[in-house]
């Protein structure tokens, strides 16, 4: 399973998502441009030493990403999605695409992507924090495969 972040704005969110990716053995794709440098102190403070434990793939733009992964199923997480995330049939190699914190993804991407899902929310609110959204959706997406690609460290009591 892959997490794809479209032009992320907030270094702390991206760092938290990379930590999640490291812990759950997920690849993280960053669609450039990011609004910050990966050497940013705010990013480094949150990512700690997890950055080296996670495959991070950077793409100069969405067109380059799409050209490389055009045969993959891309699932857009959006407040405009019609299907609720826990009713969606995730697959092992899905590319879970999350928009930028400030603006989501452009309308053009909404038009070309078929699979659009959402997290139900209070109608008085606009959106969840992107790192929280990633954690919620990824936990559900991995459930059908029973997290079989992970093992508990021997030092953790069961």
Placement of each model-derived feature along the sequence:
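Short, hinge-like loop/turn segments at secondary-structure boundaries
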Residues: 45-51, 92-94, 136
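Mid-chain, well-packed structural core segment of small domains
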Residues: 77-103
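Short amphipathic alpha-helical segments
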Residues: 17-18, 42, 87-90, 108-111
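Acidic, Ala/Val/Gly-enriched low-complexity intrinsically disordered segments
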Residues: 156-158
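Conserved small/polar residues in nucleotide/adenosyl-binding loops
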Residues: 148-154
